[in-house]
């Protein structure tokens, strides 16, 4: 079913910005609002890095997201559409970032109403990576979750950036 959804997204003829937002979400598995509000100034596309500042993160901690080559390519495709604006996923018609409902509505148009949500990428990624035996610390770091072990959370400031690139 997941493969069918990914194929449907690739073939969808919707707005380029909304389509790009749908396409990039499975690669970064950040919170929907975080990816939707991605700023050009947060990106280092040559290094494949996206840095979210602490003030916009749910947990109040800056978050570095490694970008795979596919994610970088998707972002670069948007430069002609939104490169002159602050936000990558810009709604030209309304002169603001894409709305919270943009991807949800797109998923509904694709026939996935009630079957999949924009936040679902995080659940799917976590499940698939755990099933494949990836280290839980790396997965939780990618999801920007605080460590449930308070002592480890206090002392361990590792980002596992290279491991998360896998």
Which sequence ranges carry the predicted segments?
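Active-site/catalytic core of tyrosine-dependent DNA strand-transfer enzymes
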Residues: 1-4, 47, 66-115, 137, ...
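Basic, Lys/Arg- and aromatic-enriched nucleic-acid-binding interface segment
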Residues: 1-38, 46, 57-61, 81-82, ...
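Hydrophobic alpha-helix feature that most strongly marks membrane-spanning transmembrane helices
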Residues: 7-10, 26-29, 40, 55, ...
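Hydrophobic (often cysteine-bearing) scaffold residues that line and stabilize catalytic clefts
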Residues: 14-18, 67, 71, 99, ...
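C-terminal catalytic core of tyrosine-transesterase DNA break-rejoin enzymes
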Residues: 23, 27-34, 98, 102, ...
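Active-site proximal loops enriched in glycine and acidic residues that flank catalytic Cys/His/Asp
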Residues: 26, 32, 39-40, 47, ...
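Short, polar N-cap/turn motifs at the start of nucleic acid-interacting alpha helices
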Residues: 42-49, 113-115, 134-156
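Catalytic-site neighborhood detector that most strongly recognizes the C-terminal catalytic loop/helix
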Residues: 52-60, 72, 95, 143-166
């Amino acid at each position: 079913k997941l493969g069918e959804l990914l194929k449907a997204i690739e073939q969808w003829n919707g707005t380029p910005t909304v389509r790009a937002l749908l396409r990039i979400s499975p690669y970064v598995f950040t919170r929907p609002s975080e990816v939707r509000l991605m700023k050009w100034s947060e990106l280092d596309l040559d290094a494949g890095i996206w840095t979210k500042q602490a003030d916009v993160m749910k947990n109040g901690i800056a978050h570095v997201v490694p970008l795979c080559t596919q994610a970088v390519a998707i972002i670069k495709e948007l430069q002609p559409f939104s490169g002159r604006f602050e936000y990558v996923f810009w709604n030209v018609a309304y002169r603001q970032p894409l709305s919270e409902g943009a991807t949800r509505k797109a998923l509904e148009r694709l026939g996935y109403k009630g079957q999949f949500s924009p936040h679902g990428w995080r659940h799917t990624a976590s499940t698939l990576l755990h099933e494949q035996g990836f280290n839980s610390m790396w997965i939780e770091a990618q999801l920007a979750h605080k460590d449930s072990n308070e002592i480890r959370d206090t002392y361990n400031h590792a980002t596992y950036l290279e491991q998360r690139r896998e």
